[in-house]
Amino acid sequence: LICYVSRDGKTATCPPQGKCEKYAVSASHTXHXFYVYGCTSXC
């Protein structure tokens, strides 16, 4: 799964037992930047 977090770094979407790990930064066509996270399972 992929998590998209806005520039404020406060809004992440992950499963309840998931953990977001940042691995890239992308930009949308509207020129707004987003952090790209990979959701990994966690205990």
UniProtKB/Swiss-Prot annotation:
MF-aspect GO terms: acetylcholine receptor inhibitor activity; ion channel regulator activity; toxin activity
Subcellular location, principal: secreted
UniProt keywords, alphabetically: Acetylcholine receptor inhibiting toxin, Disulfide bond, Ion channel impairing toxin, Neurotoxin, Postsynaptic neurotoxin, Secreted, Toxin
Tissue occurrence: Expressed by the venom gland.
Positions of disulphide bridges: 3-20, 14-39
Location of the protein in the cell: Secreted
InterPro entries with a match to the protein in the record: Snake_toxin-like_sf
Gene3D superfamilies: CD59
GO cellular component, one term: extracellular region
Family: Belongs to the three-finger toxin family. Short-chain subfamily.
Known role: Neurotoxin. Blocks muscular nicotinic acetylcholine receptors (nAChR).
Protein name: Venom protein E2
Native source species: Micrurus pyrrhocryptus
